[in-house]
Amino acid sequence: MEKREFYLKIDDYQLATEWILESKYTVLFTGAGISVESGIPPFRGENGLWTKYNPSFLLTSYFIKHPKESWELIYEIFYKYFNQANPNKAHYFIAELEKKGLINAIITQNIDNLHQNAGSKNIIEYHGTSRTLTCLNCTQKFDSKKLLEKEKLPPQCPYCNGLLKPDFVFFNEPIPSESQFLSNKYASMAELFIL
């Protein structure tokens, strides 16, 4: 397949700027591509994470049967590796646009927390979050930083010793209902929707 590159002309930048300035309600949608400059590879593609790891550890059935093996990979990729990444210019630019009232909401598929670390506030995490863990037994929620510092894997619920699962979407799980609702709500309110 031939590689194509797309370059915006100055007129395109001016037009985009005008649209953003004129919009009464702007929603921005981001995916893995925005975090590549921060050193986080995308999941799919030539250098994607799934070329290095078998993604089956993110199936709920596999996770429950093999919690230690699953958590070792989850911790390595989504906590140890992702926590070393810093927001890039795009994350900071988006946060600045939001601060100035030019972006009203950010819908992201990412669970790397880089939008939050850059200062963005109104973020809908479409695929959930890595910041919290939920006990599969008693459903209590916990801050992942507090429970994962010990690196005892798999982490267990301090109340019932149940298995804790990160609050991001595994392959066979639906999008969290609140994320789905808010994404639909903000998208329908958008005068300008930026992909």
Named regions from a protein language model:
Residues 1-195:
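Conserved catalytic core of sirtuin-type NAD+-dependent deacylases
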